[in-house]
Amino acid sequence: MRAIGIILAGGNNHKMRELSQKRAIAAMPIAGSYRSIDFALSNMSNSHIQKVAVFTQYNARSLNEHLSSSKWWDFGRKQGGLYTFTPTITPDNSFWYQGTADAMYQNLNFLKSSHEPYVVIASGDCVYKLNYNKVLEYHIAKRADITVVCTDVHGEDVTRFGCLKMNEDCRI
């Protein structure tokens, strides 16, 4: 695939207080031997994305330990790899990421140094299976600047998630 992958795995979920006190949400165990970030990593690996960056921040130690061996996802290639980034403390910036856009901005050099024409951004704390090749084909066919993968949410769940309003052509 002609894209790099970015997995956002730095957030703190206040609603999961007890579970997230000692580890990042993306490092939460699922079915015993998996972590929630494994789903995003597997989706990227199965879509043949060769270069993946994981932006970490909150309670990242156990997540970094889990990511320390990229052999499970086959990212250890000569032209690719698995990279982890934490907020950079400099004389000009002594803050954690101030949100998703700031995490992207603080790691802009990684994006600029990549030669792939597309970027796939995924959450590290969602459990799903997705072929990003099909998403990229759709993105190119629609000549879109940005493509967002979303699902219908109804009832009480609406307040728990970000919401999009689309027209009949699926334009946001």
Residue spans for each PLM region:
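Unchanged
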Residues: 1-172
